[in-house]
């Protein structure tokens, strides 16, 4: 699973997810992609589950790019612990996703294969998503 090798700080505040994604909202590497339509925290496990679903479906053909990285630690307190005595220990990592963010990209496969692979990955996500395609480039 994805997680940072090292971070400047061990714990982070929760923050807010306002507005749409201003970066990472266009297809950069592949021809097809999965775009988020809602804001959410996507865990490293969910990212990996989506990647596995797509990889299994397309097998040897094509290439997949993961456009998310879980760089935010989420802390949790032990069960049945009294309040106080500081913030809990980091339990897992999440990627903050805003509407418009491209989560996965695929290239080197047909549209039908890409559509099905992206659909399988979308099932693993806790948010609404949509399949997007690169616009055909004008030849000059």
UniProtKB/Swiss-Prot annotation:
GO CC annotation, single: cytosolic large ribosomal subunit
PROSITE patterns documented for this protein: RIBOSOMAL_L16_1 (PS00586), RIBOSOMAL_L16_2 (PS00701)
Region (Disordered): 1-22
Membrane-crossing segments per the record: none
Molecular function per GO: rRNA binding; structural constituent of ribosome; tRNA binding
GO biological process: translation
Organism superkingdom: Bacteria
Keywords: Ribonucleoprotein, Ribosomal protein, RNA-binding, rRNA-binding, tRNA-binding
Mitochondrion recorded as keyword: no
Bias type Basic residues, positions: 1-14
Subunit architecture: Part of the 50S ribosomal subunit.
Stated role: Binds 23S rRNA and is also seen to make contacts with the A and possibly P site tRNAs.
Family: Belongs to the universal ribosomal protein uL16 family.
Name this polypeptide is given: Large ribosomal subunit protein uL16
């Amino acid at each position: 699973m994805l997680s940072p090798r090292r971070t400047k700080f061990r714990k982070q505040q929760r923050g807010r997810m306002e507005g749409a994604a201003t970066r990472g909202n266009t297809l950069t590497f592949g021809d097809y992609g999965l775009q988020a339509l809602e804001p959410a925290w996507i865990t490293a496990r969910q990212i990996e589950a989506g990647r596995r679903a797509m990889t299994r479906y397309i097998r040897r053909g094509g290439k997949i790019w993961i456009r998310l990285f879980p760089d935010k630690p989420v802390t949790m307190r032990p069960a049945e612990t009294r309040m106080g005595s500081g913030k809990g220990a980091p339990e897992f990592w999440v990627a903050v996703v805003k509407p418009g963010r491209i989560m996965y990209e695929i290239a080197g496969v047909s549209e039908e294969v890409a559509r099905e692979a992206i659909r399988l990955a979308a099932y693993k996500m806790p948010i609404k998503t949509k399949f997007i395609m690169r616009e055909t480039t004008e030849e000059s």
